[in-house]
Amino acid sequence: MQHTVPTNALRFLSIDAVQKANSGHPGMPMGMAEIATSLWGKHLNHNPLNPHWFDRDRFVLSNGHGSMLLYSLLHLTGYDISIEDLKDFRKLHSKTPGHPEYDIDIGIETTTGPLGQGIANAIGMAVSEKIMAAEFNEDDIKPINHYTYAFLGDGCLMEGISHEACSFAGTHKLGKLICFYDQNGISIDGEIENWFTDDSIKRFDSYGWQTICVDGHNIEEIDKAIVDAKNETNKPTMIFCKTIIGFGSPNKSGTADVHGAALGEEEVIKTREALNWDHDAFKVPQEAYDFWDSTKKGSELNLDWDNLIKTYDEKYPDKSAELRRRIKGDLPDDFENSFKTFLSECDKNNTPMATRKCSKACLDFFVKELPELIGGSADLTPSNNTFSSSSSTFSNENPSGNHINYGVREFGMSAIMNGMVLHGGIKPYGATFLVFTDYARNAVRLSALMEIPSIFVYTHDSVALGEDGPTHQPVEHMVTLRSTPNLNSWRPADLVETAVAWNEAVKSKKTPTCLIFSRQGTSAISRTEDQLSLINKGGYLIDESDNSDITLIASGSEVQLIIDAAKELKNHSISANVVSMPSLDLFLQQSEEFQSSIINPDKPILVVECSHPNSWYRILNRKDKVIGIESFGESAPGSELLEHFGFNTENVVNSAKSLLND
């Protein structure tokens, strides 16, 4: 086996950075160096001088703890990561945090670290490539023509999301997805044969993947496997790479000791001797830089594509204009006016119905207007109402379909959606019941962390869903979503608020959105033009009284309840301001002046929402009150449960009177 200077440059930059930080994971970079050399040195099409080049190959490091391998590759190939940045590994505000964080300006395609999600992101990228290729490619010109590559490890395949996502990928024959499994047999606790004895080859065969086995330290074998993977166009490929974790370390290779800790000064010296590396820390010989420099080749590939696009402009001007718009992430020029017309129609024709049905009515507009809007559901399409009048099912026979049946895979769906957004050119939305956000939670969190505008649709939003009982009735879930930084949640009351919520979601550039809808019917609320214009602020006055005694606030299906309660309070000589709060998150982003214009801080506040009350204390004083739910639900008809938990006019009126009497 030959271990070249360029390959060992990867190893020792990783070793030295982890050693300097006295923190990190050197074992994986040392073990996967040959795999990286083969892929990045010969096959990966990318341009370090233009990381945003749209037809670049995507690379995902799913085993994100090995981040120094990626940072070393980016530095050596010519991205904006310097030796000083490598020396700052794991320091505050550095370009090189402990796990890779999405930053396409320096070549990092996605945030990884929570194991398994990277492979799901990569699958999402491959889905976007397949959809866009079907939409834009012509027989003579193919502007969308790239591969998605992913590195992953034993931990990724132990995580359940790997099953969800990889099964999905095989079903959809994602032939331009090529993955490399670092099969080193070691995790933090030691040798995995004590807890992970799956026959992973048979596992992936059963998914419908091509499986190839190689010596992970033999560059020639790896190179041939990549060629074979590219030649298989109807299956994703998993290349099983037998490796030695911490390769080159005389005393720690092949052990858990090298997984997540610096080698130590003495072992670093011995590793240098073992691999004949006579260079000081962070010193890379010129021959390694010469080998790795990808700026010239990348620029040439990028220029070839630019020229292809010019020809595409000439032959297919309409498609080319649409592709350019999609790459930029802009909405169509006439979209704003079209939405204003649609919103006016919603206001004029507002009728009582479940907000999940309101969402379907809105999707009939949005999906028709926005071809980049790709929907889906985790096997709840009829319940979530995600299939619009202009939807068609994505399949191998219909790769340009705009609705994906994800199966019962909430976590996989959410992480795949994130990958679709990261790819660009696609705006995905995916749905399940609100209670099952627990399954999807970490992918939703990562979308917020990455500042990408995934759209998560959650229906059946309270105990009012009824007989399915507490396993399906959300209570604490909106609190969790609302407490997540950079995540906007909406719980609209009717068709008009639903339309505004959807519009804000599709306009978003850096913030994911959760759209939360009811199973049961809701009322249609009358509004003035001024009230209509304030919905996108997150909260607004539905009814305002001079010299009001109290402010009633609600979201979603409870808005009509507080409207009715306010009318009843008038019979008791109590005047109430009524506030609809479809998005507490957005309301809290407004100025204090605006918030005070909606909620009088000098008057008592009563909030009514069919969920756990903890979200609301950010806008309340000690003596204010929330009518909410602090226990699990029960199995019964929804109307009975609402009465049982006090969501009725009488209880709201009595609570308001009690609050005023305290």
Residue ranges and their predicted role:
Residues 21, 57-58, 108-111, 141-159, ...:
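A short, small-residue-rich loop immediately preceding and capping a beta-strand
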Residues 79-89, 170-182, 205-209, 448-462, ...:
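A glycine-rich helix N-cap at a beta->alpha junction
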Residues 309-453, 531-540, 546-548, 553-556, ...:
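Non-catalytic terminal/interface segments that mediate subunit docking, oligomerization
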Residues 80-107, 373-402, 578-585:
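Anionic-ligand anchoring segments at beta-strand to alpha-helix junctions in alpha/beta enzyme folds, i.e.
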Residues 17-26, 54-62, 105-116, 347-350, ...:
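A short glycine/serine-rich beta->alpha loop
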Residues 91-103, 121, 127, 131-134, ...:
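Thiamine diphosphate
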